[in-house]
Curated annotation (Swiss-Prot):
Tissue note: Expressed in sperm.
GO biological process: flagellated sperm motility
Keywords attached to this entry: Cell projection, Cilium, Cytoplasm, Cytoskeleton, Flagellum
Pfam family, one: SPMIP11
InterPro entries with a match to the protein in the record: SPMIP11
Annotated region described as Disordered, given as residue ranges: 17-44
Protein name according to UniProt: Sperm microtubule inner protein 11
Function (record text): Microtubule inner protein (MIP) part of the dynein-decorated doublet microtubules (DMTs) in flagellum axoneme. May serve to reinforce and thus stabilize the microtubule structure in the sperm flagella.
Subcellular localization(s) per the UniProt record: Cytoplasm, Cytoskeleton, Flagellum axoneme
Gene for this chain: SPMIP11
One GO CC annotation: sperm flagellum
Subunit note: Microtubule inner protein component of sperm flagellar doublet microtubules.
Amino acid sequence: MAFFNLHLLGYQNSFRSKKRDKTEETNQKDPVPTRLPPIFSEDGNYSVHQNSHTKYHEAVRKVSLKTFPNQVFRVPLTDAQNFSFWRSNAAGARPEETMPWIQNPRHCLIKSAMTRFMDHSILNDRNFSLY
């Protein structure tokens, strides 16, 4: 905010301010508390860590967990992330199926203007050569 001549506001961390708060999204599906944790995680990272604590920390260190930007941040940080905020996080879901408005009919031009010009010139003048 220093570019608006507003000073003494403290350190601004724009990335952290846009990050999702995990406490606001926790909703208990099962009102009865279970004694054991779930075997399969719902975040899609089970194939990476396979419920192993050491494999999980290694995946965190190597940043190989499959998290999407819309799972981490509330709003897109860059313009390139806008598309990932529209997409669903379901595995195997194609964007054309979930958002049919992104499909566009293709009208292919089989012969370009230069190709048509060359065909027309060759038919009219047998001695015509481009070179």
